[in-house]
Amino acid sequence: MKIYISADMEGIAGIVHGDQTEEGPEFMQSRKLMTEEVNAAIRGAFSGGATEVLVNDSHNTMRNIIIEDLDHRASLISGNKKPLSMMEGVDMGFDGVILVGYHARAGAPGVISHTYSGIIRSLKINGYELGEAGLNGLVAGCFNVPLIMATGDDKLCEEVRAFFGEVETVAVKRYITRSAAQSRPLKEVYKDIEATAKKAVKGIKNFKPKRLEGPYAMEVAFQNIILTDMAAARIPGVKAIDSSTISFNSTEFLDVFKVFLNIS
């Protein structure tokens, strides 16, 4: 059984501010915290029956996980400019997806909430407002892989359950404001992630891939109106529908996803 882990950083316990998620005095600590939560998910996946685990480093430069500290049984994709970005490698025949360290969508309550980048105000596909968890789970669905588990703050967990239904979740911290949270004790967090990953993998037959029916209509609202004109001028098929919003339509979900990657 093959399990795929996409790992972000903003939803990791102890991380509450953007300064912790990029190069600076606190960054090495954040990398260690991220690696530990990923390791907990790996341990749980193998305990639940996984025979192979692939981790895709999915935050910013995508060179965050400390490979020498990573569970030796897992392989790692690192580096950015990947065709499927945060979901690179999910097309290689996996049985389930686990999202670690994820966060709420742009504009929603949640610690460091955003959607792929700070320039995005909102993303809608076929009327559904999506964050990274929703979008990436749908990408997995394109390859017939179900989302089985997600970790992050309590708002991320609510967002995931609202869209995907009975997916296993672990809330590692409680949202207070966009830059404040109450994190659970780390030993408790790692124990919970490991146990939940084991449960999710053991019960993997209970999960179904999430798909939306095509054709697909995407609307993206930007924080800065100049980006609307730039996207419409440079990307074939993209149209400005108002001063801050573009649209793109396709019969293929992955085409929509790749256009979003191009503008985010």
Each model region followed by its residue ranges:
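Short catalytic helix/loop segments, enriched in acidic residues and glycine
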Residues: 19-43
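A glycine-rich helix N-cap at a beta->alpha junction
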Residues: 71-90
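Active-site rim beta-loop-alpha module in soluble metabolic enzymes
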Residues: 139-201
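C-terminal accessory domains and tails appended to enzymatic cores
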Residues: 189-264
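Short glycine-enriched loops at secondary-structure junctions
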Residues: 6-12, 59, 100-105, 154
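Active-site glycine-rich loop that binds ribose-phosphate moieties when present
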Residues: 82, 118-143, 151-155
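Glycine-rich loop at the start of a catalytic domain that most often binds anionic cofactors/ligands
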Residues: 60-73
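Extreme N-terminal starter segment of soluble prokaryotic enzymes
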Residues: 1-4
